[in-house]
Amino acid sequence: MNVTAKYELIGLMAYPIRHSLSPEMQNKALEKAGLPFTYMAFEVDNDSFPAAIEGLKALKMRGTGVSMPNKQLACEYVDELTPAAKLVGAINTIVNDDGYLRGYNTDGTGHIRAIKESGFDIKGKTMVLLGAGGASTAIGAQGAIEGLKEIKLFNRRDEFFDKALAFAQRVNENTDCVVTVTDLADQQAFAEALASADILTNGTKVGMKPLENESLVHDISLLHPGLLVTECVYNPHMTKLLQQAQQAGCKTIDGYGMLLWQGAEQFTLWTGKDFPLEYVKQVMGFGA
């Protein structure tokens, strides 16, 4: 890639950041499409996020991706949110139009697209959703919009629990999907939810390095062959949860699917051009 003074900058703001495949994926796509943009990762936490946004404006960056732990905080620093982003209460994409910042959430659309591309119809189905952070709630919101009948959200009683309750209220008031929130410590309720679920989705960082030997499913017998198990974590590619699911005979979707489809939508939002999907799948090894 021959970067010139005509190139515009796109960023990714997260902490930690060095594990991310997004810079490699987006830069390969930008180079293939012949577009004058370059994509760079920046270590930005909640404390430094406000200053980073001011920097984005000052440098006239085209936009930025937003990842943990900034997805919910970022909503406070944009001028406009899409209806889906309002429902989620978190964003993963900011587009800068001459200083006017628009916030989007492509995590949900990306993950649901990955599920649909696998041939699974979510309409009328029940999802057990692990976690209440930005990615998890985005998946839940998009699933509700696209026809899930019920979402059983499980989260620890941490700083996200009240946010989970608020999220459930927004979805229940604005869609036909019924969302309940339960403490993950209630293992009996978790077991009962899995027994009747069609989809289990991990929206937490459990399974991601350095937690690669952990899973929120402590008893593999809770997983049944009729269950579709999906991951947001892609590093490592094969998480402990996915290993458990395959041992139990479940169909699985790894975190590459969400990474690919959410990134494709981001690419188009920033550039106005189509994402070179098949090329990126090949060079990144996502189809392997």
UniProtKB/Swiss-Prot annotation:
Task: Quote the record's binding site residues for substrate.
Answer: K71, D107
Q: What class of enzyme is it?
A: oxidoreductase
Positions of NAD(+) binding = A132, G133, G134, A135, N155, R156, R157, D158, K205, C232, V233, Y234, N235, G255
Keyword list (alphabetical) reads: Amino-acid biosynthesis, Aromatic amino acid biosynthesis, NAD, NADP, Oxidoreductase
Q: What GO terms describe the biological role, i.e. biological process, of this protein?
A: amino acid biosynthetic process; aromatic amino acid family biosynthetic process; chorismate biosynthetic process; shikimate metabolic process
CDD domains with a match to the protein in the record: NAD_bind_Shikimate_DH (cd01065)
Q: In this record, what's one Pfam family? A: SDH_C
* EC number(s) recorded for this UniProt protein: 1.1.1.282
Q: In which pathway does it act?
A: Metabolic intermediate biosynthesis; chorismate biosynthesis; chorismate from D-erythrose 4-phosphate and phosphoenolpyruvate: step 4/7
Query: Which InterPro entries did the record assign?
Result: Aminoacid_DH-like_N_sf, NAD(P)-bd_dom_sf, Quinate/Shikimate_DH, SDH_C, Shikimate_DH-bd_N, Shikimate_DH_fam
The reaction(s) catalysed by this protein are: L-quinate + NAD(+) = 3-dehydroquinate + NADH + H(+); L-quinate + NADP(+) = 3-dehydroquinate + NADPH + H(+); shikimate + NADP(+) = 3-dehydroshikimate + NADPH + H(+); shikimate + NAD(+) = 3-dehydroshikimate + NADH + H(+)
Q: Which GO terms describe its molecular function?
A: quinate 3-dehydrogenase (NAD+) activity; quinate 3-dehydrogenase (NADP+) activity; shikimate 3-dehydrogenase (NAD+) activity; shikimate 3-dehydrogenase (NADP+) activity
Role description? The actual biological function of YdiB remains unclear, nor is it known whether 3-dehydroshikimate or quinate represents the natural substrate. Catalyzes the reversible NAD-dependent reduction of both 3-dehydroshikimate (DHSA) and 3-dehydroquinate to yield shikimate (SA) and quinate, respectively. It can use both NAD or NADP for catalysis, however it has higher catalytic efficiency with NAD.
Subunit structure, briefly?
A: Homodimer.
UniProt record similarity statement? Belongs to the shikimate dehydrogenase family.
Q: What is this protein called?
A: Quinate/shikimate dehydrogenase
Please name the source species: Escherichia coli (strain SMS-3-5 / SECEC)
